[in-house]
């Protein structure tokens, strides 16, 4: 089976639960301590029960130092492509390349 030219990575994909935001952050920290490679969250800006994805990724990145952060679902119809690209690029710069 092909390896597609890159290492297999493992990550955590917590639900960005607005009712329990500290739990999401605890899970992200635990993912890093456990040696996982990535923490990724969903982008559903129209759902009141979910935290804003970019804000959440910023806080996760601030509380960790090695895991990469990413969206696992980007809601393109509700995100201007230029603004989305700038958000991703800014977070990548601020995290030292962890996006």
Segments (PLM) and residue ranges:
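Flexible, glycine-rich active-site loops centered on histidine and acidic residues
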Residues: 4-21, 78-99
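Conserved strand-turn element in the central/C-terminal portion of the radical SAM core barrel
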Residues: 72-78
């Amino acid at each position: 089976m092909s390896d597609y030219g890159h290492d297999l990575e493992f990550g955590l994909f917590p639900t960005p639960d607005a009712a329990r935001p500290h739990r999401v952050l605890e899970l992200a920290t635990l993912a890093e301590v456990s040696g996982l490679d990535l923490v990724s969250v969903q982008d559903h800006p129209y759902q009141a029960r979910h935290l804003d994805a970019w804000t959440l990724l910023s806080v996760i990145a601030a509380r960790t130092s090695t895991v990469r952060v990413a969206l696992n679902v980007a809601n393109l119809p509700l995100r201007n492509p230029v603004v989305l690209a700038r958000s991703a690029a800014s977070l990548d710069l601020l995290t030292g390349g962890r996006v």
